[in-house]
UniProtKB/Swiss-Prot annotation:
PANTHER family attached to this UniProt entry: RAS, DI-RAS, AND RHEB FAMILY MEMBERS OF SMALL GTPASE SUPERFAMILY
Disease affiliated with this protein: Ovarian cancer: The term ovarian cancer defines malignancies originating from ovarian tissue. Although many histologic types of ovarian tumors have been described, epithelial ovarian carcinoma is the most common form. Ovarian cancers are often asymptomatic and the recognized signs and symptoms, even of late-stage disease, are vague. Consequently, most patients are diagnosed with advanced disease. Noonan syndrome 12: A form of Noonan syndrome, a disease characterized by short stature, facial dysmorphic features such as hypertelorism, a downward eyeslant and low-set posteriorly rotated ears, and a high incidence of congenital heart defects and hypertrophic cardiomyopathy. Other features can include a short neck with webbing or redundancy of skin, deafness, motor delay, variable intellectual deficits, multiple skeletal defects, cryptorchidism, and bleeding diathesis.
Motif segment (Effector region): 43-51
Lipidated sites in chain (S-farnesyl cysteine): C201
Outcome of substituting A70T: In NS12; decreased GAP-stimulated GTPase activity leading to an accumulation of RRAS2 in its GTP-bound active state; increased MAPK signaling; loss of interaction with RASSF5
Gene from which this protein is expressed: RRAS2
Lineage: Eukaryota, Metazoa, Chordata, Craniata, Vertebrata
Signal peptide: none
GO-annotated biological processes: osteoblast differentiation; positive regulation of Schwann cell migration; Ras protein signal transduction; Schwann cell migration
Covalently attached lipid (N6-palmitoyl lysine), positions: K192, K194, K196, K197
CDD domains referenced in this protein's UniProt entry, alphabetically: M_R_Ras_like (cd04145)
Protein name (Swiss-Prot/TrEMBL): Ras-related protein R-Ras2
Propeptide: 202-204
Length: 204
């Protein structure tokens, strides 16, 4: 079977996802909407929350451990600690906040530095897409940034549950593809090798 996130005792695939982005972009709202199908209206700055959800993605059962991180700068060191264990990252900005869009570069570079990699599983999410009248970042700008970062771009809305499940599921697909490239499955033995293994000589 193809490589996957590490498996628990039941053989189920398990993935560690980390949600990162600036303060107030809706990271917690996206996460809670995905986990509990509930929209959080009050903004309460997160220090760190973790959630677990069982899913079936492309006919493969998976357990997702999701870490919702602090956007505030004073929690930067704590965020790096979580980045070390993450297997995939949702880079979240608000389409109504130009500053949060410009911060994405910082988060992406921080992840790659912590991982000591040139690339790593991430997707870019433009949240609050329902607030089109307050938009400060166009869809084209989001797509352009995603091309520069070599990641998938989606616009989402935690409020109206737009592309919420799709965002988390797509990140799992990106992780699976990355892990399969890193650790490709062992090739099937050839007929000749099978015959060789099946041949036993008995000497009298």
């Amino acid at each position: 079977m193809a490589a996957a996130g590490w498996r628990d005792g039941s053989g189920q695939e398990k993935y560690r996802l980390v949600v990162v982005g600036g303060g107030g972009v809706g990271k917690s709202a996206l996460t809670i909407q995905f986990i509990q199908s509930y929209f959080v209206t009050d903004y309460d700055p997160t220090i760190e929350d973790s959630y677990t959800k069982q899913c079936v993605i492309d006919d493969r059962a998976a357990r997702l451990d999701i870490l919702d991180t602090a956007g505030q700068e004073e929690f930067g060191a704590m965020r790096e600690q979580y980045m070390r264990t993450g297997e995939g990252f949702l880079l979240v900005f608000s389409v109504t906040d130009r500053g949060s869009f410009e911060e994405i570069y910082k988060f992406q570079r921080q992840i790659l530095r912590v991982k000591d990699r040139d690339e790593f599983p991430m997707i870019l999410i433009g949240n609050k897409a329902d607030l089109d009248h307050q938009r400060q970042v166009t869809q084209e700008e989001g797509q352009q940034l995603a091309r520069q970062l070599k990641v998938t771009y989606m616009e989402a809305s935690a409020k109206i549950r737009m592309n919420v499940d799709q965002a988390f599921h797509e990140l799992v697909r990106v992780i699976r593809k990355f892990q399969e490239q890193e650790c490709p499955p062992s090739p099937e033995p050839t007929r000749k090798e099978k015959d060789k293994k099946g041949c036993h000589c008995v000497i009298f």
